[in-house]
Amino acid sequence: MTTTNQLLASIHQGAPLFIIVDVNQYQDPLVLFKLVEGMESRPLFRDTPYRELIPYSPLLIRLNGQNQSLVDDIFHRLAGCIIESTHSLDDLNQILGEMLLAEQQSQGKVYARFFSPPMARTILQSTAMSHCWRGCSQVWLPCYRGEKWVQFERPQYNVPATLIFTQKDEQVLHAEHLTYLLAKSSAWQDIAISHVILAAQSLAQLAAIEPLSTKNMTLWSEWLAANLSVMTDASWMTLITNPISNNAKWQRAQELFNQVAENTHA
């Protein structure tokens, strides 16, 4: 785990760091443009067809060690990530653009926000997608909770390769989104992150079989926060992967928790 101060200090020791930020995460883009004023930056995905598909192209920015306000703002908005690369700003921009272009063959989908924390974690933790982030030796993403960055070492790949997301990868991505959301929610903020991850994975599994409304997602989330022990029972995964309705699962979840509680006090 690394603090923003430590990352910025490493720049003065010669570390070539860049940050990617999604302008579209800002309700008022002028807030971001003011923070990056005078900094060396490039619109990401320049010279790719996807540049025309989004209101504001993400920005690739070279950090200079004096950018704490910018980095802190991006961290708290979960709007991007930090990377280390020995390539020039223009070369790195082109390399990352090639990564996006390779995705044209990815089942017709475009993962233009591969640098957002949940998406980046999904890619970086997947062996099958280890070819991604070509040209970057390290990537830092905001931790689920707290004020530190988590570091991912990158293997060196010289040839672009297609990024293909499977249905299972989509579920993992949903779980990553939920982990970031739950970790800072009032119901989960004082609960160990290992339990938060379990809950997010459980909710993603439930939603993969039958969509959950926002109301029901909140209901399940708050119930799991109050009944953590149910997720460590051997029957839990069998229950949530059962192809029955979520209403039926809800009833059985109550029954399972009662059984777990009885066994605990027996």
Where are the regions a protein language model picked out?
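Flexible, charged surface loops at secondary-structure boundaries
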Residues: 10-14, 53-54, 74-76, 133-134
